[in-house]
Amino acid sequence: MASCFHPSAMATSHREEDSIILFSASNSPDEFSSASSSFSSSPLPTPNRYSLTVTNLSYTINHTPILNSVSLAAESSKILAVVGPSGTGKSTLLKIISGRVNHKALDPSSAVLMNNRKITDYNQLRRLCGFVPQDDDLLPLLTVKETLMYSAKFSLRDSTAKEREERVESLLSDLGLVLVQDSFVGEGDEEDRGVSGGERKRVSIAVEMIRDPPILLLDEPTSGLDSRNSLQVVELLATMAKSKQRTVLFSIHQPSYRILDYISDYLILSRGSVIHLGSLEHLEDSIAKLGFQIPEQLNPIEFAMEIVESLRTFKPNSVAVVESSSMWPENNENDGIISKKEAFRVLDVTEISYLCSRFCKIIYRTKQLFLARTMQAVVAGLGLGSVYTRLKRDEEGVAERLGLFAFSLSFLLSSTVEALPIYLRERRVLMKESSRGSYRISSYMIANTIAFVPFLFVVSLLFSIPVYWIVGLNPSIQAFSFFVLCVWLIILMASSLVLFLSAVSPDFISGNSLICTVLGAFFLFSGYFIPKEKIPKPWMFMYYVSLYRYPLESMVVNEYWSMREECFSSGNMGCLMTGEDVLKERGLDKDTRWINVGIMLAFFVFYRILCWGILLRKASKSTH
């Protein structure tokens, strides 16, 4: 199996001086030879100018080889395009180089070098490499400028507000986003159109370029774009590589003729192995030596994809291999940048404040969460009030109050499901941002709590005020205040549960099914349908973990404790049922409601801690 390898920097004005450089997949790093002497006079790279070398990179998953002895060299100021059929390992290669794949799964002989220095801590790659995934994981309800400003706040901690503003303005100008800077990013669908696909891709690139990484990796940046937008994106990358002296690698499936003009070198993969690495001219030479003629309607890359099996078997007479470190003499100025480790940050109040600000904007702009949720609470409160208007203080009224409490709980707990798609959408952004060190997941959870708790308190008030006074529940202000507290805690518990289940659910359908199943089980074992004494022992644990049980008991105690001497049913023998009898029948007393408040708070915190743990684990394995 042979591969063509020729860094474009070796090209001279005389074609006969060019050499087709090939290497076998079995070659070791020791077999690399020096480049021509023309590189000895090359100036040292300036700080943050990096050359990248990958040698013998092999990667296997579940005994299935994904990459087989892949070697490459990439220079700053130029673009290296990774080309190959679908499933050939292009995305995996970029993720490994960017430090987004567990390096323990790599072959021990595999190595990634920057400026002739081997990277031993693959976490450094996340800091040195910007990575733009194929999917544009952005928050649709932020404007283009807001998206970049928040990225700058998270990434440029040591910069002043003015410096961050200038950095954002510069990127908006460089990437041609000035005219859409105040437009919402959107998702590209009919309901939330936002900016165009090409503009959204440029926003994704800008987000990565905020911190000015020396190496930029992009996974299929032209995927889903028309030819015009694809050309604009590649042209932008080429301009940025030259003007900023950045090393750019991206995968592409089938580049057009016009795109080829902006790419310096090509790495062609087939079945995880290198088929060609070098310039377009050298690929044409290899194709010609095989006896093929490139059709006029196809460019060399497209034709190479058609004859990839022939290229796999092509073995040249002579082999010479170049290590990229020979292009760039070892640069001591960058040593500190490569070896520097980020200091551990304690609880960052500024980080949390930025996240809180972003959450508040998203809540306000999310119609189904802000407007629909508030209107839903008001309508439900008025609706229940109209059904249970002025309940009587008799035995029938006692049963109706219990039904009101149970239905209210069912409504309040199930109404939080509508936040599931929002959490799932944010989770993708969270994985990307937290995995690259923008902020910690603990900060995200704290900010989420701070932003949502006041909003959910407003929702609880909007529900409680109409239903409480129209129904005619316990008229004391203390009882009303506790009812509002109870409703608030119910919603908080439910939001934590949904947040936790969104962390373990792969998509909306499975998440919605899981939430409905869990809530249904909690309601069944709340003690409303089946008394505690009748619950089978194997299911008794559900009675204690049910989110319905504790608020239901608290509402009953709140309603009848101050009226425990009041008679709700009388007969010839006198009073047959007092408020105290109602409580005794359910095994409740005054202390129950405050104990239950503590338990509800514990559930609220518990589910958020579980969510934090799951997200933390997922972020550590994230490839975004």
UniProtKB/Swiss-Prot annotation:
ATP binds at G84, P85, S86, G87, T88, G89, K90, S91. The chain crosses the membrane at residues 369-389, 402-422, 450-470, 480-500, 511-531, 595-615. Pfam families: ABC2_membrane, ABC2_membrane_7, ABC_tran. GO terms for molecular function: ABC-type transporter activity; ATP binding; ATP hydrolysis activity. GO terms for cellular component: membrane. Its main location: membrane. Residues 52-296 form the ABC transporter domain. It is found in: Membrane. It is a multi-pass membrane protein. It comes from the Eukaryota. Residues 350-560 form the ABC transmembrane type-2 domain. SMART domains: AAA. Belongs to the ABC transporter superfamily. ABCG family. Eye pigment precursor importer (TC 3.A.1.204) subfamily. This is ABC transporter G family member 23. It comes from Arabidopsis thaliana. The gene is ABCG23.
